[in-house]
């Protein structure tokens, strides 16, 4: 769910939702309807789009509302992954419980800041990370759409069959992103599900779990693989970060 929310948010942010709708046939109508109703009178100034100058005013209005709607949902679904995986050490991404919704402020590291956007109708201050019934329904539909999209699955299986996080070719080492290092330049050790890895070992265990997210028969390992796919996208200890 964390990956799905990120994909949609980024597509919305850069005005590329048509990639999902037209390119992959992902039905975004439930999200669009929810966003237009929930943020009907909200200009969503903090969620303006970047890029795509060809957007007309109507599309722009709808997309900024979708951008805000999926951003709030992303905060909520990511908190569930973070809670389930304390070893990821990503608690700092959980921000909703630091907000004073009456004052419209957030407290970070002991300092209070005013929020630029104070309209969060789907957040319950007592349970800020709980999805509303509508948000849960939207995520369930999106999950089914992504999982049942034949074209998307075909593209992902192509990447898994042909690609890897690193490759030795013609005497050269090719690798994605950056190898995590300590300040002294030595390889940084990163804990993945209770075990420490660094360098080549880190690349191999992360790739192994990505593949498990698609192919593992053990439900626990498959779930861990899905969580790792989200982790490698945004953790500072991930080579792909």
Mark where each language-model region is:
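Feature recognizes metal-dependent phosphohydrolase scaffolds
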Residues: 1-241
């Amino acid at each position: 769910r964390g990956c799905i929310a990120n994909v949609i948010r980024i597509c919305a942010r850069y005005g590329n939702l048509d990639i999902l709708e037209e390119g992959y046939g992902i039905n975004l109508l439930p999200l669009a309807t929810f966003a237009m109703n929930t943020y009907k009178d909200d200009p969503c100034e903090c969620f303006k789009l970047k890029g795509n100058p060809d957007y007309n005013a109507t599309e722009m209005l709808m997309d900024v509302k979708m951008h805000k709607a999926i951003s709030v949902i992303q905060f909520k679904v990511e908190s569930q992954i973070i809670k389930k995986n304390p070893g990821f050490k990503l608690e700092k991404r959980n921000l909703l419980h630091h907000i004073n919704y009456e004052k419209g402020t957030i407290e970070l590291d002991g300092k209070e800041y005013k929020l630029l956007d104070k309209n969060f109708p789907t957040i319950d201050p007592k349970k800020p990370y709980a999805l509303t019934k509508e948000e849960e329904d939207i995520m369930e539909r999106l999950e089914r759409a992504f999982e049942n999209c034949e074209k998307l699955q075909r593209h992902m299986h192509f990447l898994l069959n042909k690609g890897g996080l690193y490759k030795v070719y013609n005497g050269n080492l090719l690798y994605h992103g950056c190898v995590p290092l300590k300040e002294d330049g030595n390889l940084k050790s990163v804990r993945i599900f209770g075990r420490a890895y660094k360098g080549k070992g880190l690349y191999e265990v992360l790739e192994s779990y990505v593949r498990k997210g698609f192919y593992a028969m053990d439900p626990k390992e498959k779930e861990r693989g899905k969580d790792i796919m989200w982790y490698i996208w945004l953790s500072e200890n991930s080579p792909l970060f």
